[in-house]
């Protein structure tokens, strides 16, 4: 007999729409004593079967649903099918863009809640962020080793969200032999250095690939200020597209050193590139006070809101930084601005940037709305998967 989670009356509606989360507030009772991460069946208050997922006693999300098919067992074959499907769905993109770095599995949006897997050359980097993902760790490694025998497998489960699942932060080699860092990946004919051990997230921001390429349309012969540049890839694309000058700004010495390395491995002269180790907010205010201006500014900040309680503060932060950036733009200049917080609705982000233009005393036109690259799909039943929002604004 399976372990069964019965929901309170009326709490089945989201599962009927195939949303994969069951919150603790919706649970009526539990039949059995599930281990953390163990597979459980979820039923409506009237006993109707709804889904099968992983139990988490520590999290507010107490079940993350693996399948809505009553006949589908959660076993090694299940994970093999889901991972193979995820790879198959990305094959055309890999060929088209010449990718050696891409997101292989995007958690809930690929039907594998809590499991993120990125490929960098011949290394697969896993983040196992839920109790269920952690429970099936050995099975996942076995499946990946079978389907990608050429790849080492490395874990970067050093994300605070694991604490909400009652799990420790973990990093380390899971399979094979890790090559020397940095790895070199390619996208759109451009080489990028990635350190999967010390880099942000799994090592790099693959989700901005299309936006980096698109930015090249605006920069030929222009001065570019690339804020929160990390390893300088917006600047790298700008250099390739013929920007007259580029300033890469980040607080990390290591990131800026990698930005220099990225220019070198692409055979690009960086005499027209400067690297500023600085707090972006302070530097933008300094430049405003000095009367400095630019043709193009990129704002790609880290996440400002990790939870709903932080959203109001995040709104103020986004408004402030976009206002100052607009004040630094020459008339007719271009602002590329992003939010990577899943809690920030796209319409609210656009309103914040519009309000920033008013406060800056500038006229602005939105000419592009941007999102994450297509190897970061958004599940139709999981709108939370739409986390990266971007705008291109022409500022007068």
Swiss-Prot record:
Domain PUA: 2-79
Enzyme Commission code: 2.1.1.191
Molecular function per GO: RNA binding; rRNA (cytosine) methyltransferase activity
Family annotation (InterPro entries): PUA, PUA-like_sf, PUA_sf, RLMI, RlmI-like_PUA, SAM-dep_methyl-trfase, SAM-dependent_MTases_sf
Keyword annotations: Cytoplasm, Methyltransferase, RNA-binding, rRNA processing, S-adenosyl-L-methionine, Transferase
Catalytic activity: cytidine(1962) in 23S rRNA + S-adenosyl-L-methionine = 5-methylcytidine(1962) in 23S rRNA + S-adenosyl-L-homocysteine + H(+)
Subcellular location: Cytoplasm
An annotated GO cellular component: cytoplasm
SMART domains in alphabetical order: PUA
Role description: Specifically methylates the cytosine at position 1962 (m5C1962) of 23S rRNA.
Similarity comment: Belongs to the methyltransferase superfamily. RlmI family.
Name of the protein: Ribosomal RNA large subunit methyltransferase I
């Amino acid at each position: 007999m399976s372990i069964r989670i019965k929901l309170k009356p009326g709490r089945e509606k989201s599962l009927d729409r195939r949303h994969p989360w069951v919150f603790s507030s919706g649970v009526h009772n539990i039949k059995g004593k599930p281990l953390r991460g163990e597979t459980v069946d979820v039923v409506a208050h009237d006993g109707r079967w709804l889904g099968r997922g992983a139990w988490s006693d520590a999290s507010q999300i107490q079940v993350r649903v693996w399948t809505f098919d009553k006949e589908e067992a959660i076993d090694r074959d299940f994970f093999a099918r889901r991972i193979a499907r995820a790879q198959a769905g990305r094959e055309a993109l890999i060929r088209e863009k010449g990718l050696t770095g891409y997101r292989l599995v995007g958690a809930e949006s690929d039907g594998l809640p809590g499991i993120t897997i990125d490929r960098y050359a011949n290394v697969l980097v896993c983040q196992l962020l839920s109790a269920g993902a952690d429970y099936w760790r050995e099975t996942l490694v076995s499946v990946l080793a079978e389907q990608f025998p050429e790849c080492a497998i490395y874990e970067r489960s050093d994300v605070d969200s694991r604490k909400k699942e009652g799990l420790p932060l973990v990093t380390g080699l899971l399979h094979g032999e890790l090559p020397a860092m940095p790895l070199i990946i390619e996208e759109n004919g451009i080489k990028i250095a990635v350190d999967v051990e010390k880099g942000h997230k799994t090592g790099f921001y693959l989700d901005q690939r299309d936006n980096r390429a698109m930015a090249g349309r605006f920069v030929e012969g222009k001065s570019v200020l690339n804020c929160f540049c990390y390893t300088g890839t917006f600047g790298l694309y700008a250099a390739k597209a013929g920007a007259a000058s580029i300033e890469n700004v980040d607080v990390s010495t290591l990131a800026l050193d990698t930005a220099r390395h990225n220019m070198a491995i692409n055979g690009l002269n960086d005499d027209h590139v400067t690297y500023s180790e600085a707090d972006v907010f302070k530097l933008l205010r300094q430049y405003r006070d000095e009367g400095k201006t630019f043709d193009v500014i990129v704002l790609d900040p880290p996440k400002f809101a990790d939870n709903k309680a932080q959203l109001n503060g995040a709104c103020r932060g986004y408004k402030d930084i976009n206002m100052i950036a607009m004040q630094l733009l020459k008339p007719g200049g271009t602002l590329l601005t992003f939010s990577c917080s899943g809690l920030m609705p796209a319409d609210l982000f656009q309103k914040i940037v519009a309000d920033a233009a008013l406060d800056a005393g500038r006229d602005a036109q939105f000419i592009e709305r941007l999102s994450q690259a297509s190897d970061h799909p958004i599940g139709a039943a999981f709108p939370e998967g739409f986390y990266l929002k971007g705008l291109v604004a022409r500022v007068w």
